[in-house]
Amino acid sequence: MPKLLRLLIWLAVALFGVLAVATIALHRGEQINAMWLVIAAACTYALGYRFYSKFIAAKVLALDTLRATPAERLENGRDFVPTNKWVVFGHHFAAIAGPGPLVGPVLAAQFGYLPGTLWVLAGAVFGGCVQDFVILLFSVRRDGKSLTKMAKEEIGRVGGFVAYVAIISIIIILLAVAALIVVNALKASPWGTFTIAMTIPIALLMGLYLRRVRPGKVLETSILGFVLVMLAIWGGQGASQSPAVAHYFTLTAPTLAILIIVYGFAASAVPVWLLLAPRDYLSTFVKLGTIALLALGIVAMRPTLHMPALTRFVDGSGPVFAGKIFPFAFITIACGAISGFHALISSGTTPKLVSRETETRIVGYGAMMAESMVAIMATIAACVLQPGTYFAINSPAGIVGQAPKTAAATISNWGFPVTAAEMHSLAQAVGEQTLYNRTGGAPAFAVGMAHIFSHSLGGQSVTALWYHFAIMFEALFILTVLDAGTRVGRFMVQDALGHVWEPLGRTSWYPSILSTSALIVAAWGYFLWQGVKDPLGGINSLWPLFGISNQLLATVALCVATTIVIKMGKARYVPVTLVPLVWLVSVTFTASYHKVFDPNPRIGFLAHTQLLATGPATSANARLIFNDRLDALVTGVLIMMVALILLESTLEWMRVLTGRKQARVQEAPFVTTRFATEEQG
């Protein structure tokens, strides 16, 4: 294609993107079409990948086509396995795309569609995609080392130890809650349970087919997996309608918890090519396929966003959660813009699969862009609902009341009309008894998704079908995070125990694999069990910490990335990682202060404790007081640990930049790849 024509095409993309963003940002008092959000996202991501990621790849990271990756040099058939870049992309996307991009934007929609949309677009292109890309490349150049090992080697022993304690604690909590979401989504749902269960033997079949039967035949394996998944989804509907079959797949929460714990252990212990990679690749079919279908549904339906650009709740008095746009919108929407958990995957399983350095761009930067588009779709799904419906679903009973008429009247008085009859009709349409007080974001996303699909594919008669498909989709979306997160946690435990007894640190020694897998699964499994059995909250009480914890992880990752960029002699490019780091520090530290010390009991943990102390001395109140104090303690400890890492990092930067310390990176020796003569992929 001639250079002038390419220039004109990209200029048109840029102008179209500016027009879309301007339309989103400047319209006040009138509704806009959801297509503008899709256009703005597509143009922003296209420009970001084409120009910004290319700049980072060439100038900051200097990707080398001749350098062998650890997947090639350390290949062992278990953890280090050279893998097709699209399979790696699928695994990475499936691993990073968890509850965040689905739930966060739905909850943040209480501010209106504008704040969340702008944060998702800017945060992803300049923050999240950059973090995933650079951490992945730096781990690849260090034999697939974990984030904690890189922190120890590049920042210092103290920073590395603190990073380890902070990260492993957050991983355990994150995995427990991810598992709890899956349990809540699948309990008493034979369709979802059947479909999710069938993805396991399908993944095993794909892994064996690609490894033993038809090595390298990715397209054949993809077609096989896609057909089988579609059959599993169709079979799930049949299973739910057959009393004899549904009996075996209608499971209680404790039963599901046990099964998920067993599955988590197996996923961590078996070779990555047998279950983890093919299952994540398989899940990516459903994830990307559903998101693409949702995008097509939006294009076909061209729905109107009924939620205004900004609502009255920007003042912090929102019913879904309390707090102003800054900092709470940026904490609530984590994974869709930037997520510290991604850095764990980028320095965990993924760098052990990448075949070429140049593939880190599409895997690291590209997969995060895909996840960010998921967040845009979630925003649309929430905002196409009538605001009254949205707030009826997402507002807790303690705010709007438990009786349908009371809740409807309260929400209508806010200026968002809704009636009890409308909510009853909607609940019947999706096959639920009630949709009031279905907090957490996931039910609202499912209702919005069913609304779009039923208006563009199949009509109103299949609304319930699409709603339950969305519930299954959310469970599948989240379960892959459990797979990869458990494996990352296992690697971290092996790193630590290797200092106690060297064989325990060997990722290829099977007794070490089994014992460390059992330890990490037991840790998050304990909290999962508490959450399932404890009606007063259990692990649910830690939900307010997740947004803060996730962004604190990103802060640690960007500290490591900035340190390495400086030591590479690329200090002039340090704003690439330093600017998002400074922003995250301002957001997370401000949010943490408010969550601990804010005098509003709906925001501050300690203020809520004081309020409960004035109430009746019941066991429920005593448990809630304990949970609030625990939340405040955990928040304070995490902030202090991250502050120490920031201090250690800053001191290291100053030593290197002033010449008091020689700049030396801890990269593995250069080895020429055997793929050097192949055409660059």
What do these predicted ranges mean?
Residues 31-50, 108-138, 148, 191-199, ...:
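Extracellular loop-to-transmembrane helix junctions
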Residues 53-81, 107, 121, 130-159, ...:
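Flexible loop linkers connecting adjacent transmembrane helices
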Residues 1-14, 47-102, 284, 323-328:
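Membrane-interface "cap" regions at the ends of multi-pass membrane proteins
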Residues 18-31, 102, 114, 172-188, ...:
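Transmembrane helix-loop junctions in multi-pass membrane proteins
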Residues 35-42, 47-60, 166, 190-233, ...:
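Membrane-interface loop-to-helix entry segments
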Residues 22-28, 33, 79-142, 153-157, ...:
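Membrane-interface helix-loop-helix modules in multi-pass membrane proteins
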Residues 154-172, 364-376, 439-441, 460-470, ...:
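Loop-to-transmembrane helix boundary motifs in multi-pass membrane proteins
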Residues 298-314, 369-447, 484, 529-534:
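Extracellular/periplasmic helix-exit of transmembrane alpha-helices
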